[in-house]
């Protein structure tokens, strides 16, 4: 059976996260699978590179599925874009080898978090808020300490997979773009709510509410769950997946 890869963009505001849920709860996976099953006249199960939380967006989610249908992947993509809600878009599709798996074949995931200093009715859908000025240089310093392999259990919610809490971060840093603070991070894997925990802790340190050494010390792990207030979901984007 053909193995088809879809690249997916979505505005996560109105969805209860990526992962399919029971009892009619609206999720991104559930919406795409329902439309695909209608188009292909068979039950479709998507594998995804990342399972984003409620309210988190994606610019570069990757999924794959197998189908018995003879339809070309480009026609499937066109039909999806006609039938899916406007908050979900499939910008590209391709046939991939049988052993390609959106999650397990991924080498690296990249996320970006966008934050503004004050609340905004216009930008708030796609940004978080620092609620005042922050020590930007300090946050840049803290982000450099994230690189390497660390135990991120104190920056994340309980692990659902039982695969441990060690993650290897290749790059992490802050930059400014047109008045918006942007945090970028790339790692081999991410724990549940990990990026929001990392950003929330850095914003707290930038406001002087959390000691920087305490923040860096939490990279040693220790269990007990998230020790920081996570940044709001609206500013977070799954940006790219590298294979």
Swiss-Prot record:
Organism: Chlorobium phaeovibrioides (strain DSM 265 / 1930) (Prosthecochloris vibrioformis (strain DSM 265))
Active-site residues (renumbered): 53
Keyword Glycoprotein: no
Subunit structure: Homodimer.
The protein's enzyme class: isomerase
Chain residues that bind substrate: 111
Protein's recorded name: tRNA pseudouridine synthase A
CDD domains on file: PseudoU_synth_EcTruA (cd02570)
Keyword Isomerase: yes
A biological process term (GO) from this entry: tRNA pseudouridine synthesis
Similarity remark: Belongs to the tRNA pseudouridine synthase TruA family.
EC number annotated for this UniProt entry: 5.4.99.12
HAMAP family, sorted: TruA
């Amino acid at each position: 059976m053909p193995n088809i890869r879809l690249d997916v963009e979505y505005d996560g505001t109105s969805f209860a996260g990526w992962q399919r849920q029971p009892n009619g709860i609206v999720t991104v996976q559930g919406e795409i699978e329902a439309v695909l099953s209608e188009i292909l006249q068979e039950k479709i199960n998507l594998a995804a590179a990342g399972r984003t939380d409620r309210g988190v967006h994606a610019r570069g989610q990757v999924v794959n599925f197998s189908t018995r249908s003879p339809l070309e992947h480009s026609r499937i993509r066109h039909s999806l874009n006609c039938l899916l809600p406007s908050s979900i878009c499939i910008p590209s599709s391709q046939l991939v080898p049988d052993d390609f798996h959106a999650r397990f074949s991924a080498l690296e995931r990249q996320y970006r978090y966008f934050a503004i200093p004050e609340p905004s009715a216009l930008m708030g859908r796609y940004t978080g808020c620092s609620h005042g000025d922050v020590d930007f240089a300090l946050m840049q310093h803290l982000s450099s300490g994230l690189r390497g392999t660390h135990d991120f259990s104190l920056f994340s919610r309980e692990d659902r997979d039982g695969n441990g809490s060690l993650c290897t971060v290749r790059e992490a840093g802050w930059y400014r773009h047109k008045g918006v603070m942007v945090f970028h991070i790339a790692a081999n894997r991410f724990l549940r709510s990990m990026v929001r925990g990392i950003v929330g802790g850095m914003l707290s340190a930038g406001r002087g509410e959390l000691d920087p050494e305490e923040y860096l010390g939490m990279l040693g792990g220790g269990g007990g769950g998230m020790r920081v207030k996570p940044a709001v979901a609206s500013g977070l984007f799954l940006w790219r997946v590298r294979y």
